[in-house]
Every structure is written in C-alpha cells, then in structure tokens.
Amino acid sequence: MPIPFSKKSRRNIVRQKPEDGASPKRSTRVRLRPRPDWHKRNFLTSVLIPSLFVRRSGDRFQPQFPKIQKGEICLTWIGHASFLLQTHEINILIDPNWSKWLKVIKRLKRPGFEIHHLPEIDFVLVTHAHFDHLDRRTLRRVAANQPIVVPIGVGNLVHDLGFHIVHELDYWQTVQLGPLTVSLTPCYHWGARFLADLHRGFGGFAVTVDGRTIFHCGDSAFFPGFREIGDHYKIDIALLPIGAYEPPTGREVHMNPEEAVKAFTELRAKVFVPMHYGTFRLGYEPLDEPLQRLQAAARSHGIEEKVLVMTEGKPVVL
C-alpha cells in the first residue's frame, strides 16, 4: 500500500513488505569511530585546498549510443559511481551525478557527456543518501515522473524531485519494474546524509533483465556478505568501487583495490568494472593510484582479462 505524502508533494513511497512479515536481516553498519591516528593528517591543507587549483580533466563526448539487440547490455560510465544501463527496450540511471562540486569537494574529472545528451530514462536507482551518490540537483534534472528505487529511509529525500513513485527496499527485497527485476543487496557502509539521520538505509543493487544480472555495489568496505550475494545471484557484470580507501576520518568505509579483487572473486562474477575513483578526491590517496593498484592486483590474481576499465562517456555493449 503506497504511503501518501502531503497533497503539496503528490508523491507516494512504496515500501516492500517481507512475505513472512518479518523484518529482513540487515548487515552491520560500519563503526563510525575513526582510527586513533586520524587527526595526524590534515585533509583541508593536503587535499581540499590543493584541489582548488587543479584544472578539471576529461573529454566530454557526443555519445553514440548503439542499437542494442535483445539479450545485450549497453553500459556507459558517466564518472564516479554513475552509470547509464541500457537494454533493447529500457534505459536505467544508477547513482547519477553531473555536479561540479560535492559541497566543498571539487569534481576533478568531467562527466563523460553532458546531461542533455541522455536518452529518455525509464528508471532511476540510488544506492544511498551520501552526496556523491544522491545528487538532488542531478535527480531533479533527470526526473520525468518515472519510478525511482532507493533503500529504506531514503524516500523522503527524493520524493519531491519529480518522480512518480518511490520504491523503498530493505535487504534482499525485490521490485519488478516492467522487464527489470531490482533487488537491494547488503553492504558494509553507512547511510546518513547528515549527522542525525543514521536511520537511512544503504546497499547495492542486483539488476536482472533479459536473463542477465548486473551488480552495482554502491559503497562498501570489504565484508563476508559478498560471498552471500554471489550465492543469491548469477552475476554477469560487477560494478565495484576501488577508491576513497584513505578517507579523512580514518574510518574503513570503502574497499581498497586489492579488497575489491577479493570481493569480485567471492561474487563469482564474469566481468569486473571498476568505479568510484578518478572523479572526486574523497581520500588521501592520489587520484590515479586506485586504478594502478587494481591492475597490479588483477595481474597477481590472474583475472586481468576480466577487468573492464571504462572511459567516461563511451558506451560498451556486453
């Protein structure tokens, strides 16, 4: 039963109910207490201020979206954790972000193409409420009364942006959107957008269409749940974060590249697409370090042929 908002908003949130009436089991939120030595480095002077003087890089392409056959998946990386996922009949945006700033953090690499080059979007998925994943300015521009799927507790942040129905999911819950099956998967992270809203959910998405499954991890530190996710789904393409593993707070809230390789092997996926690197300087590590470390780790584990390094704005048919 949709949960009505005020008449002013004229939007509904649909919360999926577990079949047995019990609340789905949630993974443990990461500890928010920083490491004891976190204060020994100064993120403001060593990262934020120097970034202000760095020119944005990256080419913006006039995207040439190919004609997609039934059973094919076309994936376009926009940058950071943002992807356009296309099949022969639908277009899906995941964690779209075209903004030049995350509050005081400068975007250092441009999106792969301008937002007005997007095809008509049928569905939008947002993994959690952090500013780099839930960008209200971008969502407001792409909203055209299509459904949006978010974790439980995030619906009130997006319901007034122009989406017809907001689907809130808890872990392992699923919603059917036309030919698309979307499930929220566990992760090891946290979901607060501000300091006092720790109730907000967070997770990844397993998206199944035409018999193929794409897994977008969202944000996560490494945790045993990746093996469980691999048990639940036969994953063809895994979009895994590899950056921001040296955050200014010292909290271990993101995987490093070596852990991402381990997560990929436990997921037992076929293709590894790295993301969440090279766009915003969210950690102390150099902007180009995550990809270098990933490629080295992939070689050492013999999976380099399974790693697909994408260029922002260039569609790839899989």
Regions found by a protein language model. Give the residues of each.
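Active-site-proximal beta-strand elements of phosphoester/diester hydrolases
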Residues: 74-77, 91-95, 181-187, 213-219
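Short active-site oxyanion
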Residues: 72-74, 142-148, 212-214
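Cap/insert and terminal regions of metallo-dependent hydrolase folds
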Residues: 6, 17, 23-27, 123, ...
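Divalent metal-coordination and catalytic microenvironments
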Residues: 85, 95, 128, 135, ...
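Zn-dependent metallo-beta-lactamase
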Residues: 1-93, 98-100, 292, 314
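Metallo-beta-lactamase
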Residues: 50-70, 150-212, 292-318
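Pre-active-site segment of Zn-dependent metallo-hydrolases
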Residues: 21, 54, 58-70, 78, ...
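Active-site metal-binding loops of divalent metal-dependent hydrolases
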Residues: 96-98, 128-129, 187-188, 218-220, ...
